[in-house]
Amino acid sequence: MTDMYSLFVAFILGVVEGLTEFLPVSSTGHMIIVGELLGFTGDKAKTFEVIIQLGSILAVVVVFWRRLFGLIGIHFGAVPHEGKTNGHLTLGHILLAMIPAVILGLAFHDVIKALFDPKSVMYALVAGGVLLLAAEWLKPKNPKAVGLDDITYRQAFAIGCFQCLALWPGFSRSGATISGGMLVGVNRYAASEFSFILAVPMMIGASGLDLYKSLHFLTLGDLPMFAVGFITAFIVALIAIKTFLSLIKRISFVPFAIYRFIVAAVVYWVFM
């Protein structure tokens, strides 16, 4: 039976997951710290994290549902064109961006899972922060892609290559893809939108594989806890995505980079 403390843990971790999954700050680093502080670790904790990630993914689907359905040929009215060219974001862009990480992720799955330790995550937090700073300082002054529909196939594939950095736990998938997009000439806002849309198939695939391998850790008694975490992550992620997309029109990623360095210092202080 699930006790009240377990539900409290589920709520807190759901908030952390929802807040950090799509921000360039690394949800993995935060989940490790908070999980350790709450005494929630081990195989069941890892399974729980996979399930609440699905709640965050659902939030992206809700925000971008019209665009996502349009990519697979199901249209619910016209999708507003975003950009200055006559191009259109297609399923081909998403598939191209998925290829590099899918290949490396499947080839090195066990190696990647072995990197889920505090020391490795700490270094990834720092490296991801450096990439965010590099993206802000080295990005083209006049991005070629000012909207989502301006992104070329070449840019999509390049963003997919940057996404491979996120296979290093703690690096941040959104941080890697948004930074990569900016460096190859995509507007910060458009790069963020593309990152969120790309997250749906990538995270469903990765989470589905992890869940399949850890189903034996689930029991009927865990369902209330997992439901609380899932619903909390969904609601918080929904708010976080909309707030983030509004915020990045006005600020750079420098504050996020600084925050990552602070989190890395906390990981060092807690675990080293």
Curated annotation (Swiss-Prot):
Keywords: Antibiotic resistance, Cell inner membrane, Cell membrane, Cell shape, Cell wall biogenesis/degradation, Hydrolase, Membrane, Peptidoglycan synthesis, Transmembrane, Transmembrane helix. It is a multi-pass membrane protein. The chain crosses the membrane at residues 5-25, 45-65, 88-108, 114-134, 153-172, 189-209, 221-241, 251-271. It is found in: Cell inner membrane. It comes from the Bacteria. The keyword Aminoacyl-tRNA synthetase does not apply. GO terms for molecular function: undecaprenyl-diphosphatase activity. InterPro entries: UppP (IPR003824). GO terms for cellular component: plasma membrane. GO terms for biological process: cell wall organization; peptidoglycan biosynthetic process; peptidoglycan metabolic process; regulation of cell shape; response to antibiotic. Its EC number is 3.6.1.27. It catalyses: di-trans,octa-cis-undecaprenyl diphosphate + H2O = di-trans,octa-cis-undecaprenyl phosphate + phosphate + H(+). Belongs to the UppP family. Bacitracin is thought to be involved in the inhibition of peptidoglycan synthesis by sequestering undecaprenyl diphosphate, thereby reducing the pool of lipid carrier available. Catalyzes the dephosphorylation of undecaprenyl diphosphate (UPP). Confers resistance to bacitracin. This is Undecaprenyl-diphosphatase. It comes from Yersinia pestis. The gene is uppP.
